[in-house]
Design a protein with these regions (language model features):
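A structural signal for small-residue-enriched, beta-sheet-centric alpha/beta enzyme cores
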Residues: 1-84, 94-383
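Generic structural marker for isolated residues within well-ordered, non-membrane alpha-helices
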Residues: 90
Length: 383
């Protein structure tokens, strides 16, 4: 179950020496074709990392032969030398695979403002290219982890075609992708414009709705590569739906492993005048530290939910708002509903349902609680 499940892909993960302790920290994913179509979406942070700059440029023509990824260093805020380092990573990968550097995307994750150890990385790329195999997907997924505790992978099987994916990201999760590196592969025979449209829609309903801590990374990257090796061209809508489902699976895995969390929270907003309103309300609640602390404390504090809703520009009437926690409607018509003592928040998963009674649109935002461990982990994370 990995990026090498679809036909036409190989991968590898190696310990290049970027991290301490002989941990896997560099990965290569290679597309063997016969098609080399690709698409990408990236962080909307205006302070973006050198590998984001590089990858935006090379994916613009809709063609990729490989992706090289490293953890242990973001290569962000490193100036012109950092961009040259990203290019050198692509060049080394291209040399190892016999392709052009302009056909290789680059992704990095880790500390900001630190140059990468290029001697170790170049050597690691050489070894990774030599070790590429159909069995290398698990090592590749492990190599891109930073504060993640488990690798994130998913697969979808269509009629004669498939999609595979791997992701990393445990902190700085916020709409706009989420400190994420995601590589998606498919053996469907699709052209780049179809991939681009599908990826943007899939990201919109998945990664863009994951919001652990409201912080947007400099390095967010989601790449989709198609080998065409199956020879099957699925209907574009069928493919988009399948890709969206797989990305939602990966987004849930990211939230489940978010730094220091003790609850995974799904904030479902219904009865909105527009999808934008539903997303806006969900995100505002998800970013409320008071709300997140209440969940951590096992308190279904619907007042904090209403307070967060009230600062948005969404269409609603305050005396028509309903809020439920895990199926118990604790707020009805903007006031007191069922006793909050009926709500059980002892489990890891929490479902918050907000009905605006203003229309038919809906959206679900995924988030986490705010814990002592989250503060400790981020306070101790080296800068």
């Amino acid at each position: 179950m990995s990026v090498t499940t679809p036909a036409g892909f190989t991968a590898a993960g190696v310990a290049a020496g970027i991290k301490t302790g002989d941990r896997l920290d560099l990965a290569v994913v290679s597309n063997l074709g016969p098609r080399f179509a690709a698409a990408g979406v990236f962080t909307r942070n205006r302070v973006f990392a050198a590998p984001v700059d590089w990858s935006r440029r090379v994916v613009a023509d809709g063609r990729l032969r490989a992706v090289v990824l490293n953890s242990g260093g973001a290569n962000a805020c490193t100036g012109r030398p950092g961009f040259e380092d990203a290019g050198a990573m692509a060049e080394a990968t291209a040399t190892g695979l016999g392709v052009r550097a302009g056909e290789v995307a680059v992704c990095s994750t880790g500390l900001i403002g630190v140059r990468l150890p290029m001697a170790e990385i170049t050597s690691g790329i050489e070894r990774a290219c030599a070790q590429l195999s159909r069995d290398g997907g698990e090592d590749a997924a492990t190599a891109i982890m930073t504060t993640d505790t488990v690798s994130k992978q998913a697969v979808h099987h269509g009629e004669g075609w498939s999609i595979g994916g791997m992701a990393k990201g445990a902190g700085m999760l916020a709409p706009g992708l989420a400190t994420m590196l995601v590589v998606l592969t498919t053996d469907a025979d699709l052209e780049a414009p179809v991939l681009d449209a599908a990826l943007r829609e899939a990201s919109r309903i998945s990664f863009d709705r994951a919001d652990a801590d409201g912080c947007m990374s400099t390095n967010d990257t989601v790449l989709l590569l198609a080998s065409g090796a199956s020879g099957v061209t699925p209907d574009s809508q069928e493919f988009t739906t399948a890709l969206g489902g797989l990305c939602q699976d990966l987004a849930r895995q990211l939230i489940a492993d978010a730094e220091g969390s003790s609850h995974e929270i799904a904030i479902e907003v219904v009865g909105a005048a527009s999808v934008r309103d539903a997303e806006t309300v969900g995100r505002e609640v998800a970013r409320s530290n008071l709300f997140k602390c209440a969940i951590f404390g096992g308190d279904p504090n619907w007042g904090r939910v209403l307070s967060a809703i009230g600062v948005t520009d969404a269409v609603f009437e305050a005396d028509r708002l309903d809020v439920s926690f895990n199926g118990v409607q604790v707020c009805r018509d903007g006031g007191i509903g069922e006793p909050r003592e009926l709500v059980d928040l002892s489990g890891r998963r929490v479902h918050v349902l907000i009905d605006l009674h203003a229309g038919d649109a809906a959206a679900t935002i995924l988030t986490t609680d705010l814990t002592y461990e989250y503060v400790k982990e981020n306070a101790e994370y080296s800068s």
